[in-house]
Amino acid sequence: MSDCCSPKGYRWIFSEKRAHAEARRYRRRGLDPTSRRIAELLKQQGVEGRTLLEVGGGIGAIQIELLKAGITRAVNIELTPTYEGAAQTLLRETGLADRVERRVMDFAEATREVEVADIVILNRVLCCYPDMPKLAGAAADHAREVLLVSFPKERWWTRVVISLGDLALRVGRRQFQIFLHAPDKIIATVERHGLKIVSNETSFFWQVASLRRTALAPRSGHA
């Protein structure tokens, strides 16, 4: 991982306090708009009997909704352990703890340790990782059928927001950086790994792309 983003920086941004706040918000309001749209797109394509891998899924809210909709098993991967307490509490509350495996690791650096899944989700993750091609490519390789990825769209206001956020982080001497990876480069990267875009939607800030594999991968094994 780049020197711009240390484990300490990730733990400060994605803290236990933030995790518990997100869990409380999910209990009250359900999924946020971007996450809700991702879940809707996947349900439209069919999730019954499928397996799920989510990289940077946080408290696991999307996983919970998709497990209720028919996903058989889910794996969540986080860079830091700070979300584990809040996530495990939610899983116990929903009775889904035995269907989710949560792992703490740098997915892009340890891809061989993770099995492929029918569906892979990268929701607002690429903007927090310096090496977009490595992470996006690894996610694409692990998607047997479908990859859902969301990222900031490239507009002047997203550049302003991200620049101000980075300035605040530098002033506060936080070892973390926000990245505005070019959307066309993100999509081109995953398409080089055998996926083709089937939908590409935008909101005010976020872009959500759904990509499907052109030739299905084997039902088991590692990427």
Descriptions of predicted regions:
Residues F176-G194:
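Short alpha-helix
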Residues R144-K153:
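Conserved beta-strand signature within the Rossmann-like core of class I S-adenosyl-L-methionine
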Residues D118-D131:
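A short SAM/SAH-binding and catalytic strip from SAM-dependent methyltransferases
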Residues Y129-A139:
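A short, conserved alpha-helix within the catalytic core of class I
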Residues T158-Q175:
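Short, glycine-/aromatic-enriched active-site segment of Class I SAM-dependent methyltransferases
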Residues I59-A61, E65-V104:
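Class I SAM-dependent methyltransferase SAM/SAH-binding core
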